[in-house]
Amino acid sequence: MAHTTQLTMVGTGSAFSKKFYNNSALVQFTNGYNLLIDCGHSVPKGLHDLGIPLESIDGILITHTHADHIGGLEEVALYNKFVLGGRKIDLLVPETLVEPLWENSLKGGLRYPDEDSPEPELSDYFTVRSLKTSDYGVAHTQIEENMAVRLYPTVHVSHMDSYAVGLVDRGEDKVFYSSDTIFDEYLIDYALTYPWVFHDCQFFTGGVHASLDELLNYIPEEDQARVFLMHYGDNLEDFFNKTGRMRFALQGRTYIL
């Protein structure tokens, strides 16, 4: 068991990044539970390069169904089934995404594991744990006695539900993780109630993520030091020393929360 909650950035890149792995974080709670937030197509390689075996992951939380956030789930499912003898880990999925995650994304690659098996379902590969959602504000789900998840609806792209995540360890708010969202003043106000904030960031204004300029202009200077920027493009170095007191989350770096 750890004495502190820790967050390791497995990947920090945008959907089209070639320098960085898909944006993903591994959170170790003080009870020893290892929760991976999102699992895009390059995340299994990112875990491997960090020396983190899939066997050590207790659960995966999905924030939305874009490929750079779920594209690695097929590999995890098949590895657990055929290499680890049918091991099933937790899959924490917002209740609105359980059906589309399987029907629209994973079913094509996982539908027929072998000829003699009945047609599988998502629950044949994972222990599916549905997370409460709300169209407005926050929804709270207790995962274990000392571990809870809060979901905040985000605006990312039309016709897709997506969520930011607040993590609670032993009754203490630990970190706000935006996943993917356009600039949203109300969401940032929620975020700043947490001790630490990991927020997605793009280097131009307009599009489906908050821009660096929007975040700089809205977040008070006294709060910026608690904010780490993630989900950025390959031209990261062009923006060194241009983030105010905010910092870039670094791929492979572990943060004590």
From Swiss-Prot:
Sample GO molecular function, one term: metal ion binding
Organism domain of life: Viruses
Record field: catalytic activity: 3',5'-cyclic CMP + H2O = CMP + H(+); 3',5'-cyclic UMP + H2O = UMP + H(+)
Bound cofactor: record note: Coordinates 2 Zn(2+) ions. One protomer coordinates the metal ions and the opposing protomer provides the catalytic residues required for cCMP hydrolysis.
Coiled-coil residues: none
Region (Beta-lactamase-like): 21-231
Protein's UniProt keywords contain Phosphoprotein: no
Keywords: Host-virus interaction, Hydrolase, Inhibition of host innate immune response by virus, Metal-binding, Viral immunoevasion, Zinc
Cofactors (names): Zn(2+)
Assembly, per entry: Homodimer.
Family affiliation: Belongs to the anti-Pycsar protein Apyc1 family.
Name of the featured protein: Anti-Pycsar protein Apyc1
Species the sequence originates in: Bacillus phage SBSphiJ
Gene: 147
